[in-house]
């Protein structure tokens, strides 16, 4: 059997009329509130529809609320890996766009980033090379300036803390840069990272990376490597991301979550968070 989770942030209202409309269509055995200090949420148990039918229906009905159709008795501790994207997922910015501000190329870089994240540029590695080339000559000190402005997305710390408490390995897999990923690793106690290494010479960015570029395939491989190291199956992994280069990672995981995802990512993901913070992932589970 499957359950349906509906949720909105605490500052919003979960419309009773919406819950009633949804219940009329999916015909749950019961409706139960989910206790949370950060959201208004309900669980509709044992749906009369199968998961595919319920998901198709919810894409039509659930405007204004986050939703997910999940197996019953889903527990966080049954998973072993939590894989997170960095830019626009764990943190609220696209770091390469912010680096472009110092070189006066932010608009050009941001346009390429947006196209790449929407999947309009098939070769992610080439899109990164194009953006990096626009940063050539940028002072290394700009990295620290961007770091000082960097903010975690809402619910990030709660999600990571709960994952660690349940025994999960937390992986940061990003097409961003080790300079930032390593600092986030130290700040948040992340277990491992996979990221691109900026090439820096004489105190300036060269506009290149060192080593292979971390693209969508490399993110997927990072998840598979973490699972192999732990001796678990990829279906025991949760992956969270927003862009087209996250699709391989989300597809490999047992639970793929789109966080403020691009349209193609939301269509492919098992769940989407467009309103709640990252801690919304936790409310998909009946228990830790």
Positions of predicted regions on the chain:
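Exposed alpha-helical structural elements
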Residues: 18-21, 52-57, 108-111, 123, ...
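Alpha-helical substrate-recognition element adjacent to the catalytic core
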Residues: 30-46, 69-77, 89-198, 217, ...
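Residue-level marker of motif borders
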Residues: 80-82, 114, 237
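Asp-based phosphoryl-transfer active-site loop
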Residues: 79-95, 245, 250
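C-terminal cap/substrate-recognition subdomain and adjoining C-terminal extension
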Residues: 52, 137-138, 145-288
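Non-catalytic pre-domain segments flanking phosphatase-related domains
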Residues: 1-84
